[in-house]
Amino acid sequence: MAGLQLMTPASSPMGPFFGLPWQQEAIHDNIYTPRKYQVELLEAALDHNTIVCLNSGSGKTFIAVLLSKELSYQIRGDFSKNAKRTVFLVNSEKQVSQQVSAVRTHTDLKVGEYSDLQKTQCWAKEKWYQEFETRQVLVMTCHIFLNVLKSGNVSLSNINLLVFDECHLAIQDHPYREIMKICESCQPCPRILGLTASILNGKCDPRDLEEKIQKLEKILRSNAETATDLVVLDRYASQPCEIVLDCGPYVDRSGLFQRLLNELDEALNFLIDCNISTHSKERDSTIISKQILSDCRAVLLVLGPWCADKVAGMMVRELQKYIKHEQEELHRKFLLFTDTILRKIHALCEEHFSPASLDMKFVTPKVIKLLEILRKYKPYERQQFESVEWYNNRNQDNYVSWSDSEDDDDDEDEEIEEKEKTETSFPSPFTNILCGIIFVERRYTAVVLNRLIKEAGKQDPELAYISSNFITGHGIGKNQPRNKQMEVEFRKQEEVLRKFRAHETNLLIATSIVEEGVDIPKCNLVVRFDLPSEYRSYVQSKGRARAPISNYIMLADSDKIKTFEEDLKTYKAIEKILRNKCSKSIDCGNTESEPVVDDDEIFPPYVLRQDDGSPRVTINTAIGHINRYCARLPSDPFTHLAPKCKTREMSDGPYRSTLYLPINSPLRAPIVGPPMNCARLAERAVALICCKKLHEIGELDDHLMPVGKETVKYEEELDLHDEEETSVPGRPGSTKRRQCYPKAIPECLRNSYPKPGQPCYLYVIGMVLTTPLPDELNFRRRKLYPPEDTTRCFGILTAKPIPQIPHFPVYTRSGEVTISIELKKSGFTLNLEQLELITRLHQYIFSHILRLEKPALEFKPTVADCAYCVLPLNVVNDSGTLDIDFKFVEDIEKSEARTGIPNTQYSAESPFIFKLEDYQDAVIIPRYRNFDQPHRFYVADVYTDLTPLSKFPSPEYETFAEYYKTKYNLDLTNLNQPLLDVDHTSSRLNLLTPRHLNQKGKALPLSSAEKRKAKWESLQNKQILVPELCAIHPVPASLWRKAVCLPSILYRLHCLLTAEELRAQTAIDAGVGVKSLPEDFRYPNLDFGWKRSIDSKTFISSQSSSAVESEGDCRLNTTMVPDSATSSAANHVIYTQTNDQMSVNCTPLCQKSLSDLRGVCFSEDYKAINGVSCNGVTSDSEAESGVCFQKDERIACTQEIPEKSTSFHIQNLPKENQPILNECTLSKKFLDGNVSKPTSDECPSTCTSDMQYESGLSNGYSSKTLGPNPGLILQALTLSNASDGFNLERLEMLGDSFLKHAITTYLFCTYPDAHEGRLSYMRSKKVSNCNLYRLGKKKGSPSRMVVSIFDPPVNWLPPGYIVNQDKSSDKWESNETSGEGVMANGKIDEDFDDDDEEDEDLMWRNPKEETDFDDDFLEYDQEHIKFIDSMLMGSGAFVKKIPLSSFAPPDQNYEWRAPKKPLLESAQFPSEFDDFDYSSWDAMCYLDPSKAVEEDDFVVGFWNPSEENCGTDVGKQSISYDLHTEQCIADKSIADCVEALLGCYLTSCGERAAQLFLCSLGLKVLPQVRRSVTSTNSISASSSYQKTSTRDICTLNSELSSCKGVEYGYLKIPPRCMFEHPDAEKTLDHLISGFENFEKKINYPFKNKAYLLQAFTHASYHYNTITDCYQRLEFLGDAILDYLITKHLYEDPRQHSPGVLTDLRSALVNNTIFASLAVKYDYHKYFKAISPELFHVIDDFVQFQLEKNEMQGMDSELRRSEEDEEKEEDIEVPKAMGDIFESLAGAIYMDSGMSLETVWRVYYPMMHPLIEKFSANVPRSPVRELLEMEPETAKFSPAERTYDGKVRVTVEVVGKGKFKGVGRSYRIAKSAAARRALRSLKANQSQVPNS
């Protein structure tokens, strides 16, 4: 047998590397890429009468339905007016309904079904006429139709298509035959389509077959076409070399073979003879035994004794299990008998050979022959790639370590538990060439043959390269239901296939399962170990040998070889007949391997340049180029686009070809080739011409390769930015990359320090209490102090005018105070002395009252960037107007208590005298403690009933006097003086948001009001001081309270001015809005848009844990942080939740009657009266009266539609002495006796004039014309980390979707020829975070952004101050921390003061010292020391959230220098920091000296833990910057900010304005009309940005804007949507026949029907020659729907929070939802595609939807029912369905002249039910839900391939199980797995009682 010559890849002349079968892309070079056979059959059927011979039923439906759809234009319309009808004939009644449902699913045709012959026989002619009138497709049994024809009820000429199912029946005598006879006489005859799957059954004689086919063709007057699945599967692949080998007989030298055979035969005969009577119910006792023994016998015969021994051993193990579980005695006996026989066989074998090694004497010749073939495939040494030495060094015995060998004495049946050794992850070097399958008949043969090959590999180095495995169908125990064990088996099979696909194994031993339908690679060796028994088996296994050089070897025993040769002849003949019937009858089998002729002479190549190496296409390579080009066009997984070439012989001899490219190629016209003298050349020549044309239009690049989407020919779109030269690590545009930017200073405040003798501006800071603190929140029952009750207030003195900005709130202890900044007078001058006085007072306010001065800051108003003065104003002289209160300023200068403690001495001679009026509005200072940093208290109450001799609250001291004597050795001179109840002056300086609400405006839970009340009423918990021991501060309490608001007011003013400046800048750059606002105009108030929920209802136990106590009024359960401590560690308000938004919606006040409103002023809507302040009315009455301004009881205040602001708009100041509007004076009853005391006229409060309902803005201006409200712009600049009452997240989402829409529309209109892949590439470049970040940076957004929490002591620079580098101590660095700022005990880390008693768990004091209320500072000091100590020791006991390891020692070599300033005080922050909020750091990095402790007077400067404490990565670069003047921002945050600003312009000024805004940023979304001056300095500007100081940025921007001479026009709809075509209109009418029904259904008639056709045309539908496919419209529609839905959600009155908004958006804008809706509204019935797989997926999906009939959630329960729990597979959602849902939106948009309203009018009714359903209950993707539920424990596996080519993903929830999901893509499988896991977890949760 040595003469066997195989052409193996290794020996092939093309060298070793040709022939790695899996490395070859299936792109053909000599023939056009073949199209799916179903597509070609359909084409044949459209062309002529056809009999389709198919193997599968499903393919038949596809062809029949699509054919009737294609011809449907003939059957729509009126039957009486010549429209025809289509008839489907089936053989039996039950097939009728199948066909009907197929037609109904895929078309909108009206279908009639007729299956009852009796019933229809009695119908009259009229009845039939009516049926034909009302139906377009009639499905009936052939008997009924024959009846109809015979009775002359209908004529065949009225039928356009007759479909015969199972048409082979026409050969016998059958109604089909008679129907055809009638057809013969009728002219014109209908088109005929015959379908059959059973031309071939079992063995049949080729002559008969041919005769049968010809007869059928004659009867049906058709041509038979076979599908390629009956001929070799890919008929274009080269045919494998077929070899039949005679293996010779087995010579049984030892006689063992015969003995074993005799044993087995005897045993089997015994079993057959035991005819135990079996009742039909019982199972046959001998069945298992017979099966096992005959399997063993078969192995013996086919493979020989060695294998029989192996299989006997396996079977014994398998039998043990049966025996163990067998209950019945008789059955057991038979099993034991079998066991004995098998053991006997094993014993006999052991006598002859040792089972350990393979002895060739004991295997059959077939096996020997097989091993010989395999040796031929051994790869050559030189093919070992780089690993030759590795190969040589391996000794043979360890070699198999990477295969799945197992030990022989492994006593687990290895079928069930194959213990695989771990495999190396790389394909073994041995697997590089062979890729083979051995087909065997029986399962056991496969198992043992595999074992044998592995054994041979160990002994024979020639075979060592084989890594084999076996796969046997799911044949295990057909008689048991599929159980866990089978599941294991199944998994194992899939693993085997996966390895074979990945070429980890190179040889597969398989039963016939692999012949059909399993996805495996192209093999280069197929061996039929057992001969094929029928044609189908022959052709299927042969079809697996598809590699370019492959062998199909059949092994025959000598006795069988004769008969098999006969069979083989038969198979060949059948194949030939079928091939001739193949729809492409040119036999192209040989063209692929034909010798290459030099055809260049015949037809010159297309060469780019005339030099040698120039790229060229020759006539021989052209087809490959075309195939490659088509493969690169965009398509879905189901469609493989291929060119279509028609070749016909011309009358005079030569051939000519016409080439049609897929319809989404820009080259649409058919290309006609030159006449050539053979068909092959004609095809090549036309390809060459096509290549030339493709290159000319730019579809092939200059190397003549297809142009990818990246090499876009539209360079101008990807405006290439100069890559910034920067050392900052991280990818530009990502969150990881962070950089520092100076904080912007508004131009109007820059250099605004007034100079002597120069005109100044004086502004009043008006403060009005608009919403007093409701009682529930006023725990201490403090008196509220409305700021407008006292006339003395603060003002701002500046050298420049300040633009109008909206009023805004601050939140003091008394409630919400509305702040206004009003110009008092301008143009006046001050002399030097006055200015110095004012400046000193200004410094005094910030350094002493607010104690914000620290070593790092220095007061230098002349140098500071921003240095206006804050000064007290009062009503001076008699004029009644406010002016600078110089007298008061001088008084303070003179006062002793100004800074320190005056040492007044009282004695018995001059005792202390108490004057009540001195204490009524006073701040007092205890004179006996804390001398360097005295504490200041407000006098809350004077206890006239207490004296120093009253009983002391705690038992240690009798009286107050005794306490002071004992503790401080102080004697009192006046024992009758009353005592004072005092409150701390506030150290909480961030008053931007209310304390009792979180950022969402939701009430924080409060601790029980009962406890509080009790606590505050007992003296123990009050601070009580003796007047004599205190000094009175010169600044009255009323003014002090206003001073506390200054940092917040100035900060907010600063931010709003920055926003106003941005608005003005945009007005110049983009032409949106006006540069300077009109004098008489003021924007509505800044407002957080919260509905205040302070109504008692909402408070009651908002935490389930706090039980509601029985007695008492309302319960408030929250834990607040005590306020007795003035710890700097606590100067911050940190909110529990940080995502929020400034709402822009108006909540109409509930329609309550007035009486209801009374007293509930603070219920849900109390914010509605936020901004009202009426001149001369005190706040209490005014707040309540304000409720009912509007006649219709709705607060009306909208500013354009989207921006609705809940507050009133305080308009222009009333002229002096203008009467108060009468709406404000309500009935006395309502005012509750609170009669208003008029305040001085000029008090800075304003009056609400009539409200304009619609515009919401006074004097007819609207934000549409003026530009957005600075408050809204500020929202767009505020990150959620700033913990303000609003942030950019909602606006950002809106901006994001509008940006996508604007850019999409622009690209769609500007590039009518670019296909979807290129468009989306350009879009992704433009909308990328990286691009937006660059544009935002160029515009200077980063400086204007608000990124961290406002914390005055830490990061606010008061006006007039500069950062002083020498003493800087806020410098530090860190690498990663969570900036959450929640304190250790989960409380909100607010400052320790204000509004609240100490909560028990936060008291550090000893219970013994309780009494020491007077001295409770001590405890604060000690607590501070403890805190600092613990910090330095590194225990972090105080603020758990800060991981100590994250501090890095300052980096000595790295200094970041701030522009044009001395080295600043700076703090170093890591690059990953997310716009950190520093407050929680404050305590550590800096302890204000003002808060230093008297005992140890130390200051902790920069805190630097020891080295080993720093777990920071050395490589991480830290950024060192100064907290006061700079901020560190992630690139992505800047991109977000740009989107939010876009959203802000969109909501305020409309879509056109938003587009202009984008253009001004540098994102082109509109065409330019003309350019007057081109801006030259823009580039220099952006590059110099980094190096400029803050001061110059603004000036730089303004220079730029002046030279923007660009005007933008409007987008134009791309001109043509139809191609030039001779009879385009007629084709269009054919193609869209029936679409009018769809137009009715969606209620939109198309003006241009071509858009409608385009929206439904899939890329595979080549019959549409007049429009493009839907991909471009889908690209457009996707963005439009996304924007419309996002906009709708954004404007929802429910005001969804950003998180919900995101979830809703992703739940509604996704393929699953769109596909479901498309099916619900019948889109699929009009869909035009020719793609068999897509057809089936849609079919499945539609059926599934009909069964479910329930709309989908996220990808909600998209799976089949639960029978098959083991292998969860999601039903596949056909992407094409979602696509046409989108493309139709794009089509409507274009057809309606780009009207979004029209699209929404059509789509809203479809989407509305879902929007409602989801808004009520927001769905989340299962993957996300699982990860949120089990964040630590859920782990997803990588994807595995299943045996049919799908993907499986396993998710393991540690401790709760593993869950698998399967789907066509990783994503689908992953969500299936997640869904199963969730179902299981939820089921388990519900069983566990709530513990």
Swiss-Prot record:
Residues 425-594 form the Helicase C-terminal domain. ATP binds at L54, N55, S56, G57, S58, G59, K60, T61. Mg(2+) 2 binds at E1674, D1779, E1782. Disulfide bonds: none annotated. Residues 622-714 form the Dicer dsRNA-binding fold domain. Residues 1818-1883 form the DRBM domain. Its main location: cytoplasm. One of its GO terms (cellular component) is RISC-loading complex. Gene3D superfamilies: 3.30.160.20, Dicer dimerisation domain, P-loop containing nucleotide triphosphate hydrolases, paz domain, Ribonuclease III domain. The record marks K1775 as: Important for activity. Residues 1248-1379, 1635-1793 form the RNase III domain. It is found in: Cytoplasm. Residues 887-1034 form the PAZ domain. GO terms for biological process: apoptotic DNA fragmentation; pre-miRNA processing; siRNA processing. The keyword Cytoplasm applies. Its cofactor is Mg(2+); Mn(2+). It catalyses: Endonucleolytic cleavage to 5'-phosphomonoester. InterPro entries: DEAD/DEAH_box_helicase_dom (IPR011545), Dicer_dimer_sf (IPR038248), Dicer_dimerisation_dom (IPR005034), DICER_DSRM (IPR044441), Dicer_PBD (IPR048513), Dicer_platform (IPR048512), dsRBD_dom (IPR014720), Helicase_ATP-bd (IPR014001). Mg(2+) 1 binds at E1292, D1370, E1373. One of its GO terms (molecular function) is helicase activity. Its EC number is 3.1.26.3. Binds 2 magnesium or manganese ions per subunit. Residues 41-217 form the Helicase ATP-binding domain. Belongs to the helicase family. Dicer subfamily. Double-stranded RNA (dsRNA) endoribonuclease playing a central role in short dsRNA-mediated post-transcriptional gene silencing. Cleaves naturally occurring long dsRNAs and short hairpin pre-microRNAs (miRNA) into fragments of 21 to 23 nucleotides with 3' overhang of two nucleotides, producing respectively short interfering RNAs (siRNA) and mature microRNAs. SiRNAs and miRNAs serve as guide to direct the RNA-induced silencing complex (RISC) to complementary RNAs to degrade them or prevent their translation. This is Endoribonuclease Dicer-L. It comes from Xenopus laevis. The lineage of its organism: Eukaryota, Metazoa, Chordata, Craniata, Vertebrata. The gene is dicer1.L.
